[in-house]
UniProtKB/Swiss-Prot annotation, chain A:
Belongs to the complex IV NDUFA4 subunit family. This is Cytochrome c oxidase subunit NDUFA4. Keywords: Acetylation, Electron transport, Membrane, Mitochondrion, Mitochondrion inner membrane, Phosphoprotein, Respiratory chain, Transmembrane, Transmembrane helix, Transport. Residues 1-14 are mitochondrial matrix. It is a single-pass membrane protein. The chain crosses the membrane at residues 15-37. Coiled coil: none annotated. One of its GO terms (cellular component) is mitochondrial inner membrane.
Length: 81, 166
C-alpha cells in the first residue's frame, strides 16, 4: 500500500505539496478536536464522576496557547477555605 | 477527450500550491495568537456579577462592600421625554472609565445573554454556569444593550444599560 502510494507520488510530484498541506490541516483539526474532547473541563465522559469541572486547579492551564499569562506562576489572591 | 492524463507546467503547479499555503499560514498564526490574547486576564480592577432572571438583571458589586440591585426596564408609562423606549432601565450599571472590569455572568432560571454591542460584549447567561468577560471602557457615556437569548414572554423587555463615568 505504501509502495503504491510512493510510486504514484513519483509520477505526479507536483501533487506532493498539496497532500502535505491538506494532510497537515486535516490531522491538525482532528487532533485539536480530540484534545477538546478529552481535556476540556466542560466535557465529561465518566458517568460515575459527573462533575469533573468542579475539580479544576487554579494553576493549571486549560487553554491551548497562552500568550502572556503563565498559569503556573499566578499568585494566589484568595483566602483558604 | 477527457483530461485525465494531461499534465503540463508542473513547476508552476507546485509553486502555486506551496506559495498560497505559506501565505495563509503566515496570516493564520498571528491571527490565532491574537485570538488567544483576547481571552487573557487583564488584571481587572474589580468584579461585577450579573445575574439574569425572567425578566430583569441583578447586579452585584461585592468587592468593596455589598451593593446588590435589580435592573428593570422602564415601563412606557414611566418614561420621561428623551428616554429611550425598551432601552432605559431604572437602575443603571455605573462603572468608571479606563478601569478593567470583570463581569461574571450567570442566570437564575433560563438562558439569557448579557450584551452591550457598542463595547463588543456578548456573553450568555447560563443557569448553573459562570461565564466571564472582561472589558475596559475608554469613553464615558451611556451604553445600551438588550438580552440576546430568548427567555420567555418579556425577552425583548430586559435591557442592559451601562453608565461609564470619568
Amino acid at each position: 500500500m505504501l509502495r503504491q502510494i510512493l510510486s504514484q507520488a513519483k509520477k505526479h510530484p507536483s501533487l506532493i505539496p498539496l497532500f502535505v498541506f491538506i494532510g497537515t490541516g486535516a490531522s491538525g483539526a482532528t487532533l485539536y478536536l480530540l484534545r477538546l474532547a478529552l481535556f476540556n473541563p466542560d466535557v465529561c465522559w465518566d458517568r460515575n464522576n459527573p462533575e469533573p469541572w468542579n475539580k479544576l486547579g487554579p494553576n493549571d492551564q486549560y487553554k491551548f496557547y497562552s500568550v502572556n499569562v503563565d498559569y503556573s506562576k499566578l499568585k494566589k489572591e484568595r483566602p483558604d477555605f | 477527450l477527457t483530461n485525465t492524463s494531461i499534465s503540463d507546467a508542473q513547476e508552476m503547479e507546485t509553486i502555486w500550491t506551496i506559495l498560497p499555503a505559506i501565505i495563509l499560514i503566515l496570516i493564520a498564526l498571528p491571527s490565532l495568537r491574537i485570538l488567544y490574547l483576547t481571552d487573557e486576564i487583564n488584571d481587572p480592577s474589580f468584579t461585577i456579577k450579573s445575574i439574569g432572571h425572567q425578566w430583569y438583571w441583578t447586579y452585584e458589586y461585592t468587592d468593596y462592600g455589598g451593593l446588590i440591585f435589580n435592573s428593570y426596564m422602564l415601563p412606557p408609562l414611566f418614561l420621561e421625554p428623551g428616554d429611550l423606549r425598551l432601552l432605559d432601565v431604572d437602575n443603571r450599571v455605573v462603572l468608571p472609565v479606563e478601569a478593567p472590569v470583570r463581569m461574571m455572568i450567570t442566570s437564575q432560571d433560563v438562558l439569557h445573554s448579557w450584551t452591550v454591542p457598542s463595547l463588543g460584549l456578548k456573553t450568555d447567561a447560563i443557569p448553573g454556569r459562570l461565564n466571564q468577560t472582561t472589558f475596559t471602557a475608554t469613553r464615558p457615556g451611556v451604553y445600551y444593550g438588550q438580552c440576546s437569548e430568548i427567555c420567555g414572554a418579556n425577552h425583548s423587555f430586559m435591557p442592559i444599560v451601562l453608565e461609564l463615568i470619568p
